[in-house]
């Protein structure tokens, strides 16, 4: 081992890999006047108008209702998956399903069902059912603490009347968290044509209507911040019923589209066009070395860049929500809530419009979103920390010599 301390060793390797990533990273800014465009974007927040409010409200309602139905169905399916989660086939199937992002599922179902509500719902339900199934199973297992002599012989009765009620608060808490995630996921489905908030966000950005962009973002923040008031044990049943009534254009299964998808759309070119062996090898070589390998390499570089940026952001900003460093952490909480409530795709899209295509928009988006989450977690952890009696009163010394060494291991765990 390079250093005796494990955290120092990990940090050294992390920084070294980050430096190498910077060498290969494309951080260019290709827009003609990026700072002028940035100032226009942030300056437009004071010029919000409601001329397009009817379109935005419709998209907002679509976003909310799709997310409600998706999480309702996903939680039911997830619970059944959790019951049979011990099966290796189920575990592998769920792992594969949840590893595919909802945007990719949306692109698949758009080819089969077209641009409608059903495609959007399936794009959320399939990966979220797999995620909920895995986490529900883990929650049920963690709460299965009763000794064998108290379980009785009827396993079904034990499961329904003892195991589930004991774990129920944790199941509900995680489902509510996933509902917040579903709102963000549904919003970004607009980038592929579904009429949710992301659809109008993309349209207004392309047209330079930044005041409308801010209206969308502010409405989305309000929805996220008030979830506990409009989606709780008293309102979720009426909300589910209202969502089914509100949503329209469910579409229908087109056999022709389904056949075309499996017999043409996803069939590799060598099989579709009957390539010769040499042409097939050339096709595969180009695909492997010019697209797959390049994509994998760029993904690794962006990941390492975003980790470096995230680490710096979290270490700089966790004090703004820590009572050890600020007497009024409220405004720091608001700042971090806004950042972590904004989907990474929306942040990346904003930076893409401001700075042009490169690795910079993705790295900055991941930094702000993930950095805000880690800052919030670390800041809350420091609030529970008991300081030594002889601790210094100077903030910088308290940060470097008292707080940071004690939370650094947990910080690395959150980061990786």
Give residue spans per PLM region.
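Hydrophobic alpha-helical transmembrane segments of polytopic membrane proteins
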Residues: 197-232
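A structural signal for multi-pass alpha-helical bundles of membrane permease subunits
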Residues: 19-32, 98, 106-114, 177-180, ...
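N-terminal, non-cleaved signal-anchor transmembrane helix
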Residues: 1-84, 88-91, 220-333
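Membrane-cytosol interface at the C-terminal ends of specific transmembrane alpha-helices
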Residues: 117-178, 182-185, 357-416
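Transmembrane alpha-helices and adjacent helix-loop boundaries
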Residues: 31, 40-47, 88-89, 99-106, ...
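Loop-to-helix entry region at the N-terminal start of transmembrane alpha-helices
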Residues: 58-66, 101-131, 290-303, 340-375
């Amino acid at each position: 081992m390079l250093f005796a301390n494990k955290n120092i060793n990990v940090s050294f390797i992390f920084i070294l890999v980050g430096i190498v990533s910077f060498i290969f990273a494309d951080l260019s800014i290709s827009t003609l006047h990026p700072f002028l465009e940035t100032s226009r974007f942030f300056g437009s927040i004071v010029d919000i108008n409601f001329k397009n409010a009817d379109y935005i409200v419709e998209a907002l309602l679509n976003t909310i209702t799709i997310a409600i139905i998706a999480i309702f169905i996903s939680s039911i399916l997830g619970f059944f998956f959790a019951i049979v989660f011990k099966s290796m086939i189920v575990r592998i199937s769920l792992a594969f399903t949840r590893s595919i992002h909802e945007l990719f599922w949306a692109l698949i179902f758009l080819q089969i069902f077209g641009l409608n509500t059903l495609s959007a719902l399936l794009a959320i339900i399939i990966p979220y059912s797999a995620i909920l199934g895995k986490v529900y199973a883990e929650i049920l297992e963690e709460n299965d603490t009763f000794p064998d002599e108290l379980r009785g012989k009827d396993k079904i009765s034990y499961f329904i009347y003892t195991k589930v009620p004991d774990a129920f608060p944790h199941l509900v808490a995680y489902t509510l968290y996933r509902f917040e995630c579903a709102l963000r996921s549904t919003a970004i489905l607009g980038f592929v044509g579904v009429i949710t908030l992301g659809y109008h966000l993309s349209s207004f950005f392309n047209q330079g209507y930044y005041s409308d962009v801010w209206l969308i973002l502010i409405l989305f923040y309000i929805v996220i911040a008030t979830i506990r008031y409009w989606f709780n044990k008293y309102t979720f049943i009426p909300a589910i019923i209202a969502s089914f009534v509100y949503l329209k254009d469910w579409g229908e299964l087109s056999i022709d589209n389904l056949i075309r998808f499996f017999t043409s759309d996803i069939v590799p070119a060598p099989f579709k066009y009957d390539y010769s062996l040499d042409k097939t090898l050339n096709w595969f070589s180009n695909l492997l070395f010019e697209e797959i390998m390049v994509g994998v390499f760029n993904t690794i570089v962006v990941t390492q860049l975003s980790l470096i940026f995230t680490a710096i952001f979290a270490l700089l900003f966790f004090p703004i929500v820590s009572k050890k460093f600020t007497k009024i952490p409220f405004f720091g909480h608001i700042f971090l809530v806004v950042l972590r409530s904004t989907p990474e795709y929306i942040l990346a899209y904003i930076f893409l419009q401001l700075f042009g295509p490169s690795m910079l928009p993705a790295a900055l988006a991941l930094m702000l979103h993930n950095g805000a989450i880690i800052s919030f977690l670390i800041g809350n952890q420091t609030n529970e920390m008991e300081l030594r009696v002889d601790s210094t009163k100077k903030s910088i010394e308290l940060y470097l010599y008292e707080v940071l060494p004690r939370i650094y291991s947990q910080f690395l765990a959150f980061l990786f």
